[in-house]
Amino acid sequence: MKLHRWNEIAEEHLNPSLERRAIHTDRLTIARLNLKQGCVVPNHWHENEQVSTVEQGRLKFVYPGGAIEVGAGESLEIPSGVAHEVIALEDSVVLDIFAPRREDWVSGDDAYLRR
């Protein structure tokens, strides 16, 4: 077992409105992201299943055929391969869990987040 403390994990400043801390295990990634109001995570998809739990604020997830708002205390399940865009309607903190782990984040091949 290994104990992780969020405040001891290096924070990545991906762009002026998005910051991330991440833990990568052999089989999953868990990340805590801070999004400033107005932040847009551009439309993208990945093979990973994703569960996003909003801890603070409100996010709008836009996907083919619709959109859904997720607020504090709510979780959204995003199946593998589903394209989605995220818009921060308020300053927000979200906990994202991915399986399998985000190899693109491990390797730094996540340019869509760094715009």
Predicted regions mapped to residue ranges:
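A short, N-terminal "cap"/entry segment at the start of jelly-roll beta-barrel domains
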Residues: 1-27, 31, 107-115
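Short strand-coil-strand connectors
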Residues: 26, 62-66, 89
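Conserved short histidine dyad/triad with adjacent acidic residue
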Residues: 31-45
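Short, conserved beta-strand element in jelly-roll/cupin
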Residues: 35, 46-61
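A cytosolic small-molecule/anion-sensing beta-strand core signal
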Residues: 55, 71-72, 90
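Short acidic-glycine-tyrosine-enriched beta hairpin
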Residues: 65-80
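Ligand-binding loop in jelly-roll beta-barrel domains
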Residues: 80-104
